Amino acid sequence: MGTSQAFLVLSCLLTGPSLIVCQLLLPSILPNENEKIVPLSSSFSLRCFGESEVSWQHPMSEEEDPNVEIRTEENNSSLFVTVLEVVNASAAHTGWYTCYYNHTQTEESEIEGRHIYIYVPDPDMAFVPLGMTDSLVIVEEDDSAIIPCLTTDPDTEVTLHNNGRLVPASYDSRQGFNGTFSVGPYICEATVRGRTFKTSEFNVYALKATSELNLEMDTRQTVYKAGETIVVTCAVFNNEVVDLQWTYPGEVRNKGITMLEEIKLPSIKLVYTLTVPKATVKDSGDYECAARQATKEVKEMKTVTISVHEKGFVQIRPTFGHLETVNLHQVREFVVEVQAYPTPRISWLKDNLTLIENLTEITTDVQRSQETRYQSKLKLIRAKEEDSGHYTIIVQNDDDMKSYTFELSTLVPASILELVDDHHGSGGGQTVRCTAEGTPLPNIEWMICKDIKKCNNDTSWTVLASNVSNIITEFHQRGRSTVEGRVSFAKVEETIAVRCLAKNDLGIGNRELKLVAPSLRSELTVAAAVLVLLVIVIVSLIVLVVIWKQKPRYEIRWRVIESISPDGHEYIYVDPMQLPYDSRWEFPRDGLVLGRILGSGAFGKVVEGTAYGLSRSQPVMKVAVKMLKPTARSSEKQALMSELKIMTHLGPHLNIVNLLGACTKSGPIYIITEYCFYGDLVNYLHKNRDSFMSRHPEKPKKDLDIFGLNPADESTRSYVILSFENNGDYVDMKQADTTQYVPMLERKEVSKYSDIQRSLYDRPASYKKKSMLDSEAKNLLSDDDSEGLTLLDLLSFTYQVARGMEFLASKNCVHRDLAARNVLLAQGKIVKICDFGLARDIMHDSNYVSKGSTFLPVKWMAPESIFDNLYTTLSDVWSYGVLLWEIFSLGGTPYPGMMVDSTFYNKIKSGYRMAKPDHATSEVYEIMVQCWNSEPEKRPSFYHLSEIVENLLPGQYKKSYEKIHLDFLKSDHPAVARMRVDSDNAYIGVTYKNEEDKLKEWEGGLDEQRLSADSGYIIPLPDIDPVPEEEDLGKRNRHSSQTSEESAIETGSSSSTFIKREDETIEDIDMMDDIGIDSSDLVEDSFL
């Protein structure tokens, strides 16, 4: 640049660019005009002069148009000249032509130079042809824009339209329409010589842009290993017109891969990602992203430094030394600073053993402070002596490993571990041994007090010197922190006190010991031995008392309850001992012969017996006799007497084991009940299972797991239990084995048991679709085993149990242990409900679970009985449902495979119920489900259960059953005959034409009795007024009649009202009573 040129530049800087002189800095164009019109198809040239090399910018490049030529001319002056020549000019050559200095132009700056605008009018082309990108007009929101529809003739009038609507806007033929336009398509129109010309659509698109770029740079990490992939992202928010450039070490190698992702929700976000795969150490350095807004000249950049290592590394820096101490019970923390990549694994060891993380006294913790920096802490909480040792921290990853070990000592105050009189010499000498511990190791000193009475005063103690005659002191170290000292006295003539003192920097420990002269020691030894013996005796007595109290006691399951609230929801147990016992039930012991044992338990047994004189029609009758073992306690005798009184209170019924008599005087208590020929229902079902399966082949034979049997070995099955000392089951009365008899009086007459005649009936309603032969119904309520066990037999058992429980409910009696093992089967397949707990070893029976001092049949109990100890008739209904499951699984154990534990209790609470057994119909299973309702009020009563099951049986079954029941009540069965005297008095003053009228009256009372138990809760009991012993028989009969009447009126029950036979006289009744002994004494005092 010459001197004149430099002067011009300086003048422009001082005076401003508006001066004419500054224009000299730009090149010159000839012709020197702002615009020029060139005829179509003509040629024109433009000449550019400048101080340095110059170039041209024009509407069409030389590559696109061969009609354009640019050349450089040489001249004698110092100026540079470039000529642009166009031949055969067309409308496409219309536009700006600019000459500029080459050295003033950069890629990012706009062209600065001299301009001239050339028009080439074309009558066939009013508008300059558009380029590929000219039809898209991008503008920032709410900013002005230019729609570049340019004309080839400056005098052409142009209009702008948007969807057919004229848009007012200012127009410049060299620029186009300028204004603020809404988004959408626009078309320019022009009319030349009567012809209308239209441009193609210009689409205006508004972009969102702000004055700030809001640039954010992020990288997942700043430290990498060789071979890993570097990923860096830059995000721009709320801007759509952004130009972003990356600068990074690998840029020159074009190693990076860039991507752009646009996210529009919830706000506009442009995410630029740079990925450098397989990084090397050369890729370490600064990574920069620079964003520039295309429309507002706003620029922002972010930088992050990334380091790439050949491999991973680990560095540790502990904040403590190799030897550390901690005071006893002190809280101490040891911190190690770690720098590592990749992420390290940190572990602590104590004496080469890994510390468990969940220790409460020693804890370890790792916290990440920065990308590659970590802090690991070892914390001792209330340090203990055993915390001393060598601690090691190990930090490692796949490429490197570092460790650091330090020794920790717990400083412990001195204390005395042991002070004993260790040795007695033959001449009266004694040695005292003192063991002390502490860290640092303590020193031991000895002190002596010769006046025992003044040893409480420290001034009476003197330090024992090591050089005293007849006294020897010595010390030995035992371990790191334990020391032992000994002092020996040649002779001790009187009692003295010796004190051992242990001292270290943290504290002092001391203990004292008395040395007794040998003459006094023997006296103390004798006193100590007597005291120890006394303590042993007292402890033994306490243990025996506890064991005796925890021993299970016999408890009768049947309970009579009485309501204490109007709705029956609250009740109390009636004390059975308050119930009266009528001496008419007394039976002479010499009229009873005892035989084989039928069942035996922890508290008593049931034996087979023969009774003489119980019934006029059967002078000799086979009976079952309940009795206690000889070792029974008074509480168990009282429980058996309570059972007797409850049975007398209940009265007779076909489907309970009826009381026949009792022996309560001059010996052990015997309760005489009916003899049940077939034993308990469980064993009966087991025994007849094969016959049932043969009649019902459609029922699959399963693996019998619920019976505990082995199906593969049929020869090992035993459905009849012959031994009762172990499980207490009732024996099969048909079993002909040799048993041990307990004779009291030998009689040779043959026992005869009255047989209840069976009845025929129709088939059940629920089986109407099946054809039932008469032979299939013959074995119901009969002993005919030719047909085997049938499904109708199971329904018959179900019905009879419901009727028996209905009777107990009418008497306010709660069974509490209703199960198939407590249901017996008599001749005629008559079901008898009983309480067989006396003759069952419940302590070894898996069906009973220990609860305190009693055993409970949990699997048969209702939830309110298990969890709330609440027993009502409705809880018996639940047990009845479990009994049905036993019957229709042919004697299976409820909840097969489930143990009675917390899981079992939780399942019952959550509503778990057993599935339908194999041999139950859907109607029968529906009964079970109703019985197992978790809400007691929604369970059916036994009255309704009887009706439901009755509908499943043949139509004539109920009539046959009622006839058998009525025949039973009309018979001279001992249970009926002994109650008839009271019931006959209820008919005093009432005249009947015949026995049938009386039966009809009784049947009406029976229906009332069944309805009285239908409430599902508790019927109020009449007041019990025991009969005075001195009243005669007639007075007692009148009282019993009144009581029965009151009970019938108040409870709606006529269970105690029976039929007086027409041929029966008072003399007959008296003769029956004469069989017993004197009734003046009701029971021995020892049982009350």
Swiss-Prot record:
Q: Which residues cross the membrane?
A: 528-548
State the name under which the record lists this protein.
Answer: Platelet-derived growth factor receptor alpha
Region annotation Disordered: where it falls in the sequence: 1017-1088
Q: Where is the Protein kinase domain?
A: 592-953
The UniProt subunit note reads as follows:
Interacts with homodimeric PDGFA, PDGFB and PDGFC, and with heterodimers formed by PDGFA and PDGFB. Monomer in the absence of bound ligand. Interaction with dimeric PDGFA, PDGFB and/or PDGFC leads to receptor dimerization, where both PDGFRA homodimers and heterodimers with PDGFRB are observed. Interacts (tyrosine phosphorylated) with SHB (via SH2 domain). Interacts (tyrosine phosphorylated) with SHF (via SH2 domain). Interacts (tyrosine phosphorylated) with SRC (via SH2 domain). Interacts (tyrosine phosphorylated) with PIK3R1. Interacts (tyrosine phosphorylated) with PLCG1 (via SH2 domain).
The protein's GO terms of the molecular function aspect are:
ATP binding; phosphatidylinositol 3-kinase binding; phospholipase C activator activity; platelet-derived growth factor alpha-receptor activity; platelet-derived growth factor binding; platelet-derived growth factor receptor binding; protein homodimerization activity; protein kinase activity
Which reactions are catalysed by this chain? L-tyrosyl-[protein] + ATP = O-phospho-L-tyrosyl-[protein] + ADP + H(+)
Q: What is its EC number?
A: 2.7.10.1
- State the organism of origin: Rattus norvegicus (Rat)
Q: What is the lineage of its organism?
A: Eukaryota, Metazoa, Chordata, Craniata, Vertebrata
- The answer, when asked if Phosphoprotein is one of the entry's keywords, is yes
Q: How does it sit in the membrane?
A: Single-pass type I membrane protein
* UniProt similarity note: Belongs to the protein kinase superfamily. Tyr protein kinase family. CSF-1/PDGF receptor subfamily.
The segments annotated as topological domain Cytoplasmic are: 549-1088
Q: Which residues lie on this side of the membrane: Extracellular?
A: 24-527
Q: How is it modified after translation?
A: Ubiquitinated, leading to its internalization and degradation. Autophosphorylated on tyrosine residues upon ligand binding. Autophosphorylation occurs in trans, i.e. one subunit of the dimeric receptor phosphorylates tyrosine residues on the other subunit. Phosphorylation at Tyr-730 and Tyr-741 is important for interaction with PIK3R1. Phosphorylation at Tyr-719 and Tyr-753 is important for interaction with PTPN11. Phosphorylation at Tyr-761 is important for interaction with CRK. Phosphorylation at Tyr-571 and Tyr-573 is important for interaction with SRC and SRC family members.
Protein keywords: ATP-binding, Cell membrane, Cell projection, Chemotaxis, Developmental protein, Disulfide bond, Glycoprotein, Golgi apparatus, Immunoglobulin domain, Kinase, Membrane, Nucleotide-binding, Phosphoprotein, Proto-oncogene, Receptor, Repeat, Signal, Transferase, Transmembrane, Transmembrane helix, Tyrosine-protein kinase, Ubl conjugation
In this chain, composition skew of type Polar residues spans 1040-1058
The record ties this protein, via InterPro entries, to: Ig-like_dom, Ig-like_dom_sf, Ig-like_fold, Ig_I-set, Ig_sub, Ig_sub2, Kinase-like_dom_sf, PDGFRA
* Positions bearing Phosphotyrosine: Y571, Y573, Y719, Y730, Y741, Y753, Y761, Y767, Y848, Y987, Y1017
Please give the activity regulation comment for this entry: Present in an inactive conformation in the absence of bound ligand. Binding of PDGFA and/or PDGFB leads to dimerization and activation by autophosphorylation on tyrosine residues. Inhibited by imatinib, nilotinib and sorafenib.
Signal peptide residues on this chain, from the entry's feature table:
1-23
